[in-house]
């Protein structure tokens, strides 16, 4: 009732509202709007009030996700006047999405220096063409799987089917109506899959089963590097990559073991069968059979006081890994991209030494640090 009596022009009230908006509302509720005028094709200035209030939350690279679901990594710089500017990669985003003069772009912050972008024409109507930009990131993986899989057309088609199922779901609030025949083709398999999830949940795991997996343990940093064989060699890390990753200043607690994992495009799909494989050595040493079937994940660098995601950890005869809705939410909320490198730091209780499998937290807790290759080098995404 008190709020209703406050005058519309009360400066104290406005300051209080500003404070609540920027300091207490969820970040994914925050937006900014900008018009494409002047020389907009080479760079774009982020509104200063938005940039100032997000100081420290926007890294040297941001991810822009168009309505099609495709994501661009854009380099960030500061102008001579201190303005935050999107530069490297911005022109490619503009060209691919057909952004023209006097168009209006609405940016919604989606976490981890990431934005969902809607594009409107000068009349104020959303443009249709950005919804249909080819997602070459997923296409590259499908082509690789088909080329190196050797007679796995069924797998390839299945992967493509999951992609078709994902796209309308994620953009359902903006898509036009789909003809009934198309709906049957897109969603009929998903209905049938609901009844056989437990039977086939391992069919779409990534390719780090025992026979295709190698683990390199860095004795000093206790990094466990996974190598993916077979059809997913594009996600392998070279020796130079591993050395560079080991040099990145990641806030890992001394003595905590770290699983280093490259994220596949398939890990980011809405398929309920996708599993992020964990190496047998790491799982056997630190996530043994006596451990709970749930892992708590937190973003690294937060000191354990931030958001948490409860992720299912599954074990099967020849594989083990993170699986299910909890993992998909973690990947979505943190803006993970294919080829990101996740460092899963298992937090041990104080005083637990190397190989001490009894002195873990009651429920396994992992701080996840994310590295991304930007202009040829790995950087820590905060």
From Swiss-Prot:
Where does it reside?
Nucleus
Q: Do the record's keywords include Metal-binding? A: no
Q: Where is the composition biased (Basic and acidic residues)?
A: 136-158, 193-202
Q: Where is the composition biased (Acidic residues)?
A: 203-218
Its predominant location is nucleus
| PROSITE patterns named among the record's database cross-references | B3
Protein's recorded name: B3 domain-containing protein Os03g0622100
Q: Which residues bind DNA?
A: 29-123, 261-363
Q: Does the keyword Kinase apply?
A: no
For molecular function, the Gene Ontology terms on record are:
DNA binding
Q: Name one Pfam family in it.
A: B3
Which key words are in the record? DNA-binding, Nucleus, Repeat, Transcription, Transcription regulation
Q: Origin, by domain of life?
A: Eukaryota
| UniProt-listed SMART domains | B3
Which parts of this chain are annotated as the region Disordered? 136-222
The organism is Oryza sativa subsp. japonica (Rice)
Which Gene Ontology terms of cellular component type are present? Answer: nucleus
């Amino acid at each position: 009732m008190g709020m209703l009596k406050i005058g519309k022009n009360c400066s104290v009230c406005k300051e209080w509202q500003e404070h609540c908006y920027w300091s207490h509302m969820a970040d994914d509720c925050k937006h900014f709007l900008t018009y494409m005028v002047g020389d907009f094709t080479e760079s774009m200035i982020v509104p200063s009030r938005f940039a100032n209030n997000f100081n420290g939350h926007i890294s040297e690279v941001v991810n822009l996700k168009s309505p099609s679901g495709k994501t661009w990594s854009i380099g960030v710089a500061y102008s001579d006047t201190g303005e935050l500017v999107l530069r490297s990669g911005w022109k490619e985003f503009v060209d691919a999405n057909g952004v023209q003069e006097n168009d209006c772009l609405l940016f919604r912050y989606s976490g981890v220096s990431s934005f969902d972008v809607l594009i409107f024409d000068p009349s104020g109507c959303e443009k249709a063409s950005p919804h249909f930009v080819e997602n070459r990131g997923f296409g590259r993986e499908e082509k690789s799987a088909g080329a190196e899989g050797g007679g796995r057309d069924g797998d390839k088609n299945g992967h493509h089917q999951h992609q078709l199922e994902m796209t309308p779901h994620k953009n359902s609030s903006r898509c036009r109506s789909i003809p009934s025949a198309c709906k049957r083709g897109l969603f009929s398999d998903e209905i049938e899959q609901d009844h056989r999830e437990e039977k086939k949940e391992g069919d779409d795991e990534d390719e780090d089963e025992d026979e295709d997996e190698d683990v390199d343990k860095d004795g000093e940093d206790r990094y466990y590097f996974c190598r993916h064989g077979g059809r997913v060699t594009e996600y392998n890390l070279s020796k130079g990559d591993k050395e560079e990753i080991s040099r990145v200043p990641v806030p890992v607690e001394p003595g905590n073991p770290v699983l280093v994992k490259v994220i596949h495009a398939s890990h980011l799909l809405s398929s309920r069968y996708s599993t992020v494989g964990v190496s047998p050595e790491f799982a056997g040493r630190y996530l043994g059979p006596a451990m709970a079937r749930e892992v708590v994940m937190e973003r690294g660098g937060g000191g354990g006081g931030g958001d948490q995601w409860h992720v299912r950890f599954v074990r099967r005869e020849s594989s083990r890994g993170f699986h299910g809705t909890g993992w998909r939410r973690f990947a979505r909320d943190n803006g993970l991209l294919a080829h990101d490198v996740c460092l899963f730091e298992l937090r041990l209780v104080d005083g637990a030494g190397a190989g001490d499998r009894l002195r873990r937290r009651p429920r396994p807790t992992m701080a996840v640090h994310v590295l991304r290759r930007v202009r040829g080098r790995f950087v820590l995404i905060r």
